[in-house]
Amino acid sequence: MTDLTDLTLAAALDGLKSKQFSSAEITGAFLQAMEKSRVLNAYVVETPEKAMEMARASDARIAKGEGGRLEGAPLGIKDLYCTKGVRTTACSNILGEFTPTYESTVTQNLWDEGAVMLGKLNMDEFAMGSSNETSRFGPPINPWRRKGDNAGLTPGGSSGGSAAAVSGNLCLAATASDTGGSIRQPASFTGTVGIKPTYGRASRYGMVAFASSLDQAGPIAKTVEDSALLLEIMCSHDPKDSTSLKVETPDWRSDVRKGVKGMKIGIPKEYRIEGLSEEIEALWQQGIAWLKAAGAEIVEISLPHTKYALPAYYIVAPAEASSNLARYDGMRYGARVEGNNLTQTYEASRASGFGKEVQRRLMIGTYVLSSGYYDAYYLRAQKVRAKIFQDFVGAFEQCDAILTPACPSTAFAFGEKSGDPLEMYLMDVFTVTANLAGLPGISVPAGLSASGLPLGLQVIGKALDESACFRVGGVLEDAASFVAKPDRWW
């Protein structure tokens, strides 16, 4: 019998339904794997007792012929989602040992369908980062390594723990979040599938906020089908989130096998950036060839304001963060450092509670919102954002979906880029546009680099057309036949 931790989410659900194994058995297998894999540092909180309790409850429901769409499936939860009674810190010192008294809407949706929680997953502090090096718990380690090199590699960020856990078979799938590429970049780095849905599809209630107009929940999973299955359940209208869309959630799982015959796929010329590696260019061309062979029509499109996307993002996101993170003052919850007066207590709590990258972004955000610079920076960035949205509106008059690389590089070693914030920020160059425009985007593993590391392709769809992402993603997955797994060194 296959090792239970090797199963895809879809295969595990089939096995649970047909009683080939119990939820207690598969949950126990994952808990054992987690115990043996702590060197990966994927989990920051393990919940074995809660997991087994949930698994036994699932088994009882399955025995009665009852159960939800995720009944008995063990999942990992990014430490950004509030989980009632389980510590949630967004991997920041300032939240101390904060334990929520309520459940986020996304995780509640999962539990309502019978999912089992294995624990909370590592991430960049407050989701600010592209390498997961800003976590208070230290970075998770990518299960993949370069050929002939033992250097520890980043699993990407900010959802690095989610990507490392799925890639290392430490959960069937995981929740993640994406503000500028934090689902799609880690998925590309770890040979997993990650999708960011349309802004407003999934509720942000109970998600620790970074940049409210950009943050969006989504899954990281082993296959395109698994990601569709999980996203269907994560998404719902929620009156507790004012940005939540009142729209039906389609049957995305059925879209995965519909093919791309008759679809028009746009190739943006502006994504051929200076210095793009030959490997990634070749993979992009291979993706184009696969879609053509599957019956899609390829059209060149233009997204003229692409070059302004990163600068606009790194003004808008820190500005929103400086507003959102003002609530952390050591008074009502989280860590407090006493000062001689109230102001000093605020200053000391924030100075010791926020890490360097978070402090950097808060300073940028406060600066661009200050009265003398608001018009020069923030207002202009919002105008650029509107232009980027209009670029996509025009492009989608010519095509049904857009194909690009997911990342400008493969996974890099820890410390390789952390000394240069600008080089680190460039990791988001292909992903931020979808966040600024509120569009869905999926990263699908499509090949290996010469050094043996995964490479992903990204598909961007029209607003509320995740179906196109899943259709194209399914074809890319079939054509690439990506079955490579990291050699177990841990």
Swiss-Prot record:
Entry EC no(s): 6.3.5.7
Source domain of life: Bacteria
Chain segments carrying region Disordered: 131-159
GO biological process, one term: translation
Keywords: ATP-binding, Ligase, Nucleotide-binding, Protein biosynthesis
GO molecular function: ATP binding; glutaminyl-tRNA synthase (glutamine-hydrolyzing) activity
SUPFAM superfamilies: Amidase signature (AS) enzymes
Active site (UniProt): K78, S158, S182
GO annotations of cellular component type: glutamyl-tRNA(Gln) amidotransferase complex
Keyword match Chloroplast: no
Assembly and binders: Heterotrimer of A, B and C subunits.
Purpose of the protein: Allows the formation of correctly charged Gln-tRNA(Gln) through the transamidation of misacylated Glu-tRNA(Gln) in organisms which lack glutaminyl-tRNA synthetase. The reaction takes place in the presence of glutamine and ATP through an activated gamma-phospho-Glu-tRNA(Gln).
Family in the record: Belongs to the amidase family. GatA subfamily.
Name the UniProt record assigns to this protein: Glutamyl-tRNA(Gln) amidotransferase subunit A
Organism: Hyphomonas neptunium (strain ATCC 15444)
Lineage: Bacteria, Pseudomonadati, Pseudomonadota, Alphaproteobacteria, Hyphomonadales
